[in-house]
Amino acid sequence: MEGKVIEVQSAWREGAHVDDAKYREMYAASVADPDAFWAEHGKRIDWMKPFSTVKNTSFEPGKVSIKWFEDGTTNVAHNCIDRHLETRGDQTAIIWEGDNPDEAKHISYRELHAQVCRMANVLRNRGVGKGDRVTLYMPMIPEAAYAMLACARLGAIHAIVFGGFSPDSLASRIQGCGSKVVITADEGLRGGRKVPLKANVDEAIKRLDADLVDHVIVVRRTGGSVAMEAGRDVYYDEAAEQVTDECPAVAVDAEHPLFILYTSGSTGQPKGVVHTTGGYLVYASMTHEYVFDYREGDVYWCTADVGWVTGHSYIVYGPLANGATTLMFEGIPTYPSTSRFWEVVDKHKVNIFYTAPTAIRSLMGGGEGPVKKTSRQSLRVLGSVGEPINPEAWEWYYNVVGDRRCSIVDTWWQTETGGILITPLPGATALKPGSATRPFFGVKPQMVDAEGKVLEGPCEGNLCIADSWPGQMRTVYGDHERFEQTYFSTYPGKYFTGDGARRDADGYYWITGRVDDVINVSGHRMGTAEVESSLVAHPKVAEAAVVGYPHNVKGQGIYAYVTLNDGEEGDDALRKELVTWVRKDIGPIASPDLIQFAPGLPKTRSGKIMRRILRKIAEDDFSSLGDTSTLAEPAVVDDLIENRQNRG
C-alpha cells in the first residue's frame, strides 16, 4: 500500500492556491524566516492596533513561553462577522441542518451579526465581561456558534463541554475554569433521540460549591419540560427579547485567551488547553483556506461537534474568518438512513467535506449502495481528521465517495496545536493512502528516538515539533508547570506530540498513533487513567488497567483488565454493570468495549503496571511481549493470554 502514489490531478491544480513548486517555496521561506513569513500572513485578519513584534517564543526548559503578535489588539467576532458585512452581508454564513432532515436554516452574515450581538448583550446583562469564563454545554444548533462568538465579542473566554459528557465530567470542567455562567439547551437531539442537557447541568451544579454558578441560560431546542430554578435559570428567547442587537466588539490583546478546551491527559485529570486570540485566528483561517483550497463561494462542511477542537477551528472560527459558508450538522451519519451525509451534500451542494475515519469506516460497512444512490457531484475536496486513516478506508473514501475525482486531505493535528500541522494541499501534494504527507507552512516536525536523538531521513520514532507556530496552545489553564511537564520535558527544547510516526524516503509522515497512555476512540482522545479511576471507584473492583486495541469501526476500542476484590465473581452481569458505571461516570464515549477479569496485572518489582504487555495481549499478539523476567509475577501473563477477550 505504501508504494501507491496518486498524483495531483490537473483539475485539482486548476485554480488552486498553491502547486508543488509554490508549496516548496512558501514552506522554505516559512521555516527560514518565521518572523518575516508570519508578519506577512498575520495581516490576513483585521487588527485594531497593528502588531510590531511577531514571534516571541521559547521551548527552553523552565522558560517555556509562547507569544505571537503580542503588542497587537483585535477581536475574533469582528474578524468573523463585522468585517464581512459591507461586502457579503447577505451571503449565508451558516447553513444549519437539523437532526430531522426536514429542518434547515440559512443564517446570513447580517443575521449572524444581530444574533451574536443579542447573545452578547444577554451575557453582559448577567455580568459577563473581559476575562470571565462561560461554560457551554450545547447541542449542534446555531445558538452554540452565537454563544462562542458572543463570548469572543466581549473578550470573555468560552469553555465548551461536549454534550455527550456526564454530569460529573461537566461539573469538574465548570469547577476547573470557575464559570459563573452556563449556557445550555432544554434537550439535544441526536439520531432521533433526546439528550437531557438541562437535567445534566442541574446534576452537575449540585456537585459544585453553591455560590459558583450564578446563571444558567437555556435555549429551547425541543420545547421539552425542564426544571427551571427561579433567580438562576432563564430561557434564552425571553432574555433576548429584553436586549438590542447592537453590541460593540471589545479590543483585546493578541494573547488574550479566546477559549479553554479540556482534553484527556494520561494522568487522569483533564487538562484545560488555553488558546489565545491573534495567533490562533491567523492560523485557523490560513489552514482553512490552504488545506481545503477554500475558494470564494464554496460551501464547506465539517461534520465535527463544536465540543471538540475541530468544531472550534473548522466549523466556526477558520471558515467565518474567511467569509465562508459553513455547514453545521445536528445529526449523525446513520439517521434516518446511512445515506444521510451524502443526501446533505446534495441538498446543500457541498464542495468541501471534512469528517473522521471512524465515520468513514462505519459507513463503509454498509457498502456502496447508500453512497451511490446520491450524486455528490458538487464535492471537490474530501478531508479526514481525528486519527490516522487506514489505507482501506482512505481508498473507499477516494474511490466510492469521491468517485476518484476529489482530492483527499488526511490532516494530522491536535487540540493543543489549534490547527492542522501535517497535511496534503489539494493542488500541490501527490497522495499516498494512509499518509498525512507533509508539514504545513511554519511547522518543523522532528523525529526523535527514545533517547531524544534527532533522526534524519526515512525512520520511525517519536514525533516532535522543533519550533512554535501561531496556533499553538499557550498553557494549561491555571497550571503552567503541567504544560511544561506534559509537552516539553520528555524531549527538552521540543514540543512532544505524544504520537509516534514514520517518515518515508519522500519525507512523507505516517502517523502510527499514541505512544503515551491516551487512546483514540472514534477520533476522540480518552485518557486511560480517567477510565481506570472510574472502574476502580466501583465497590467490587480492586484494580483496573485500560489500553486501546484495534477496532474496525472506532479505530481504537477500550480494553479493560479488571481485578476484583476477594470473594467477587466476574461474570457477564458484572461486565454490563461496569460498562453502565463508566458510561454514567464519564459518558458513553468512555464505555469499555471488552472487559477481562484478571486475578492480577503484570507489574514490575517496583509496582508499575506493564502496559506494553497489556497492549500486546489486547491486540492478540504475543509474538513480541519482550522481556517479562523483570515482572514481579511472570505467571500473571500466562493467565491473561489464556483468558483474553480478543481472540483473532
Swiss-Prot record:
Transmembrane domains' residue ranges: none
The entry's keywords: Acetylation, ATP-binding, Ligase, Magnesium, Metal-binding, Nucleotide-binding
GO MF terms held by the record: acetate-CoA ligase activity; AMP binding; ATP binding; metal ion binding
Modified how: Acetylated. Deacetylation by the SIR2-homolog deacetylase activates the enzyme.
Residues reported to bind CoA: R190, G191, G192, R193, T310, S522, R583
UniProt-listed PANTHER family: ACETYL-COENZYME A SYNTHETASE (PTHR24095), ACETYL-COENZYME A SYNTHETASE 1 (PTHR24095:SF14)
Listed name of the protein: Acetyl-coenzyme A synthetase
